Design a protein with these regions (language model features):
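Anionic-ligand binding region
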Residues: 133-164, 168-173, 183
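Acidic, His/Gly-rich catalytic cores of divalent-metal-dependent hydrolytic chemistry
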Residues: 163-246
Length: 246
């Protein structure tokens, strides 16, 4: 089994197009998408048009859920413009996607953790704002009851692979479209990828073991940075331009 995992596109259609081209160039046919597809000050409509035509397996992220279960006046600055850009058929397509699913019997997919789409799985935010790899005991608690040998998550925008003591693997492929962001929960913190590249992962099962290849893809990030800046999001513009929000 060999497939690509993408996540956290956040309306960055140019990054998505570049990643899909790279996936094809690597000879990979199957794709799974771990959610947070559209929200952001970029181009939700172009992004969902690409995703709806893509032969892929999808799950929803927390921002996808916000687009479906919150009234526009209660949406945040990333969700409101995305919602306004989508038509009824596109929202219906989004609504049809599950929160979790199993891919080909061996891969468990979720956006954040199996039971909560807003909690970091592989990383912990400390009171001083530092973001670091979580203790293995905490990581394994979230994985209880999952039978699949490979577990995929996203949400943090940080590419990671963690092997559990029982041999299962948890992989976060990183973010296709958002190399940095600021959040307030559980403590104020920033996440910064350090480069503006679009990120995804290729997973391959070989002789009973999962091999992970993280890919960093060059694309016209300056165009997306300019769009974010025009739409009043200077920190995201910095992240898209450089991989740093500060």
């Amino acid at each position: 089994m060999r497939f690509a995992a993408i996540a956290d596109v956040h309306g960055n259609y140019l990054a998505l197009e570049a990643v899909l081209a790279d996936i094809r160039a690597q000879g990979v046919a199957d794709i799974v998408n771990l959610g947070d597809m559209l929200s952001g000050p970029l181009d939700a409509r172009r992004t969902i048009e690409i995703l709806m035509q893509l032969d892929a397996v999808h799950v929803l992220g927390n921002h996808d859920r916000y687009l479906l279960d919150r009234p526009p006046e209660k949406m945040g600055s990333w969700d409101r413009p995305a919602h306004a850009a989508l038509n009824a058929a596109q929202l219906d397509w989004l609504r049809a996607q599950p929160m979790t699913r199993v891919f080909r019997e061996q891969v468990f997919m979720c956006h954040a953790t199996p039971d909560n789409d807003e909690v970091y799985w592989l990383d912990t935010v400390h009171p001083d704002g530092a973001v670091a790899l979580s203790p293995l005991d905490r990581i394994e608690q979230f994985a209880q009851g999952i039978a699949q040998s490979l577990i995929l998550c996203a949400h943090t925008h940080l590419a990671r692979a963690v092997r559990l003591r029982d041999g299962r693997m948890i992989v976060n492929p990183g973010s296709v479209g958002g190399p940095g962001f600021r959040d307030k929960h559980p403590f104020p913190h920033v996440v910064e990828a350090g480069t503006p590249h679009a990120r995804y992962a290729i997973l391959e099962l070989t002789d009973g073991a999962w091999q992970v290849t993280f890919r960093h893809v060059v694309y016209d990030h300056e165009a997306m940075a300019a769009l974010a800046r025009r739409n009043g999001q200077p920190e995201l513009a910095n992240a898209l331009a450089m991989g740093w929000i500060r």
